[in-house]
UniProtKB/Swiss-Prot annotation:
Catalysed reaction equations from the record: L-serine = D-serine; L-serine = pyruvate + NH4(+); D-serine = pyruvate + NH4(+)
Name recorded for this polypeptide: Serine racemase
Positions contributing to Mg(2+) 1 binding: E13
Modified sites of kind N6-(pyridoxal phosphate)lysine: K56
Residues the entry annotates as binding Mg(2+) 2: D178
Residues engaged in binding pyridoxal 5'-phosphate: N86, N154, G185, G186, G187, G188, M189, S313
Residues annotated to bind Ca(2+) 3: E210, A214, D216
Source species: Bos taurus
GO molecular function: ATP binding; D-serine ammonia-lyase activity; L-serine ammonia-lyase activity; magnesium ion binding; pyridoxal phosphate binding; serine racemase activity; threonine racemase activity
Amino acid sequence: MCDQYCISFADVEKAHINIRDFIHLTPVLTSSILNQITGRNLFFKCELFQKTGSFKIRGALNAIRGLISAHPEEKPRAVVAHSSGNHGQALSFAARLEGIPAYVIVPETAPNCKKLAIQAYGASIVYSEQSEESRENITKRIAEETEGIMVHPNQEPAVIAGQGTIAMEVLNQVPLVDALVVPVGGGGMLAGIAVTVKALRPSVKVYAAEPLNADDCYQSKLKGELTPNPYPPETIADGIKSSIGLNTWPIIRDLVDDVFTVTEDEIKYATQLVWERMKLLIEPTAGVGVAVVLSQHFRTVPAEVKNICIVLSGGNVDLTSLTWVKKQDEKAAP
């Protein structure tokens, strides 16, 4: 594997050892109804049941435990990160486990339930504008003021390696899997999974799932160069508004087989379908992968790619904001 990547599979193996006693082995569930709709065998990796309600605890915990093992004589004074919510919760939880103060820079538009959860885990919240530039500038300032260490939500190698442990579990839980479908924002989970899958089972496909309104990963693959979103995207999938970055892009460029995009209505329909048929309260970000498999475009994937695992990335839903559910009921399915 290319030595220019920020992580190798060995890093994922180390992460697995580092975090396995502190996280859940999340289940893989199936749905005969969704199998019937898609004509494929679908498997759902339920990271909504993970500690803090999303996969993000894997990377955050691996990063913080790595910092401590690297400097056992003195813990970091603080850890600092920017997050739309899930990484912030995960970092807060992991920092509290290790007795380290955490500061999370959150856009004011982040779901209220995620902001409250960050505070409940003991972190201090600092608000930013929605743009990447605003979040990163404030994160740097807070890190300087607190003498803290920044833990990037998707470009930090230890975070990427931690997210890759999802694929180690899936390959054991679904031995005959033909493909994984993974939501992508900054690309930490996608990159970690791609490194792991291509190291252990190169024939297994890795597909990225992305909102059409935040399609920087698709555009980057199409153009063959890193192409960030030109402006803050508007999508219900709030967990994947970030663009892929310098560390995740080379892995995605080389190891991800294809990128599929879906509309906002497709995301809403898929999310509600999982709620109603599988009784799983996923957040819309997790619904993006389901929407992809339900989409017309996905029918171009060869029929022999039969056994597909969709990573349900999280379940931190702001129930007070679901005004779109009634509106969606009034529409025909896309």
